[in-house]
Amino acid sequence: MSFFALPILFFLGFLILLLAFFIVKQQSAAVIERFGRFQSIRQSGLQLKIPLIDRVAGRLSLKIQQLDVIVETKTLDDVFVRLKISVQYKVVKEKVYEAFYKLDYPHEQITSYVFDVVRAEVPKMKLDDVFVKKDDIAIAVKTELNEAMMDYGYDIIKTLVTDIDPCLLYTSPSPRDL
């Protein structure tokens, strides 16, 4: 073996050893795949993987996150109203696999459910009732979201109706309303 081969082998061995270690931050999880197939979920701390065989496929935050959704809909008394719904959610630590592999875009999924529930609830109410029953709207959104998102590894912590803004333009009454 030549004099130059030994340092090169030492350097390559050191590099492969470095590739074996990785760090997972506090309140997050790392998904490990081996040749593209799920291998394990690693929690916070210094972790070890087989270099060149295992890879970190992704990381998920276990912190509470907030998504603000603005929904525009019409009330029972034909007033357009814009509601800002704040959804606080997090990935359940025991369901990281589901959160990573079953759902690609959680923000869009949550937004769709918020739109669906708000557009089902608000048209049954008059404008004044929307202000009075904003907690009922928030509870309805949370209940619906929690049922749907728990299967995907997400827990809905709280939903809040943070802003209700009636639009200045009123729709003209239909002939049957006169």
What are these regions (language model features)?
Residues 2-21:
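Single-pass alpha-helical transmembrane signal-anchor segments
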